[in-house]
Amino acid sequence: MKIFRSAIVLFIFVGTSPAFAGTEITAQNVSVLNPQRFEFAVESGYLFGAINAPASYEIGAEFLTARVRWGVMQDDSWLRGYNQFYVSAIAEPIFRGIENHYFGLNLGMRYNLVRPGSRFVPYFSGGLGLGWIDSHPEIPGGQGQDFTFNILSAAGVSYRVDEHWKINVGALYQHLSNGGQTNPNPSLNLFGPQVGASYSF
């Protein structure tokens, strides 16, 4: 968790430091603080089990995400930015672990920190959702049932290629649990890098 917090601080520093201001955005482009309203993103991550994992886990995290801009903070401080509400479809092959795959949905909010004239936009996000895993409760440490809840948290930096396209890199945390509906409930905590690309319109 300390590593995750440190990553958030680093990403905020990178995006707000003058040394990382990037190429100035021309007047013809859409304002960074008032971007186009809708956005679709494809993102991939590679997650590792941590924090009392019941077994050694390595998971490929694939996300198809729709976002809509919702609220802008007009401020001269480093908090200047805008919100996005998002819905993500999740597909995760489990390369190492007791189970084989996970499918789910996640709903949440993302906040983007922006500076005038910068193409770099630090962000952080969090959401809740539900999904299904091919559980194996007969195996010690296996998930107790197919239905699970999920929690996602992420922090990273987007780079604005043009008025429509952005690429991003960041860190992702995922928690899977059935909320105590089975006993035992060997939940999963997963951390790892994430990259993606998005299109705004």
Description of each model-found segment:
Residues 64-66, 188-201:
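Outer-membrane beta-barrel "beta-signal"
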Residues 1-33:
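Cleavable N-terminal export/targeting peptides
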Residues 22-37, 71-83, 97, 114-121, ...:
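Short loop/turn motifs that connect adjacent beta-strands in outer-membrane beta-barrel proteins
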Residues 68-70, 111-113, 157-159, 199:
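Residue-level signature of outer-membrane beta-barrel architecture
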Residues 47-51, 73, 90-96, 130-138, ...:
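Sequence/structural signature of outer-membrane beta-barrel proteins
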Residues 63-67, 106-108, 152-154, 194:
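Membrane-embedded beta-strand positions in outer-membrane beta-barrel channels/transporters
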Residues 38-48, 85-91, 124-130, 169-173:
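Transmembrane beta-barrel strands of outer-membrane/channel proteins
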